[in-house]
Regions:
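Membrane-embedded alpha-helical segments and adjacent helix-loop junctions characteristic
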Residues: 1-60
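Juxtamembrane and boundary regions of transmembrane helices in multi-pass small-molecule transporters
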Residues: 2-5, 39-42, 57-156, 182
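Generic, well-ordered alpha-helical scaffold segments in large soluble proteins
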Residues: 9, 13, 30, 52-56, ...
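Membrane-water interface of alpha-helical transmembrane segments
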Residues: 12, 16, 64-67, 155-162, ...
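Hydrophobic alpha-helical transmembrane segments
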Residues: 19-27, 70-71, 112-116, 166-170, ...
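Alpha-helical transmembrane segments of multipass membrane proteins
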Residues: 29-33, 80, 118-126, 130, ...
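Structural signature of hydrophobic alpha-helical transmembrane segments
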Residues: 42-46, 118-119, 186-195
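Flexible hinge motifs at transmembrane-helix junctions and intramembrane kinks/re-entrant loops
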Residues: 128-135, 158-163, 172-202
Length: 202
């Protein structure tokens, strides 16, 4: 529920211009990369939302706009696998290999400083390339913004579970980003602790 709420909240602010909706999809993929440590899980969360957006905007499933939105979203998910250490399992495997072979660790912040600029550049390039390859049929989608607003309103206020997940996610992000600066806990350990907290009853 929280991932859908974040996606709709972002898309509700981008308006009805198709170019802004595409930018919104990239922003959603970027934000979720910070709190969902799996590209597969992020794609599984975002794709149904984007399918709903396409339907809400009244676009044909075989339209260029639909293809543009879906392909851009999935590629944005992959792009941010590079920029954020905890965004993909293969990053953690690579770091484990470096630790074992070279005795060198890479903190979350060090990874982000080194790799995030590449993901940002790729995201910008992705937008322009996709808009060039699959130009949408129209510049505006009448009623699209209202449809997103209605979907967001239908979700109602945040539930206790969503608030708890958001609090744990933001805390975990803060702990990840201060790894090696304020504490010595590695990303894997703090992730396991966060999962344990989410599994607690109540």
């Amino acid at each position: 529920g929280l991932d859908r709420r974040i996606a709709l909240a972002v898309l509700s602010r981008v308006g009805a211009r198709t170019s802004h909706v595409v930018i919104g999809s990239i922003v959603v993929a970027t934000l979720l990369a910070f709190i969902v440590p799996s590209a597969t899980a992020r794609a599984a969360a975002i794709i149904p939302i984007m399918m709903g957006i396409i339907v809400a905007f009244g676009a044909e499933k075989k339209s260029r706009f639909a293809a543009l939105l879906m392909i851009t979203t999935v590629q944005a998910v992959s792009v941010w696998n590079v920029g954020i250490k905890t965004a993909a399992a293969q990053n953690m495997v690579a770091i484990g290999f470096l630790q074992k072979q070279l005795g060198h660790d890479v903190s979350w912040l060090d990874w982000f400083i080194a790799a995030a600029p590449f993901s940002l550049a790729l995201s910008i390039g992705l937008y322009f390339i996709m808009m060039w390859m699959l130009p949408p049929e129209s510049k505006d989608v009448p009623g699209g913004h209202e449809a997103v607003e209605k979907s967001l309103e239908a979700m109602g206020p945040m539930t206790g579970g969503e608030k708890r997940l958001l609090a744990v996610s933001l805390t975990l992000l803060a702990v990840w980003s201060t790894e090696g600066v304020l504490h010595r806990f590695d990303s894997s350990t703090t992730t396991v602790i966060a999962i344990a907290l989410l599994l607690l009853p109540g």
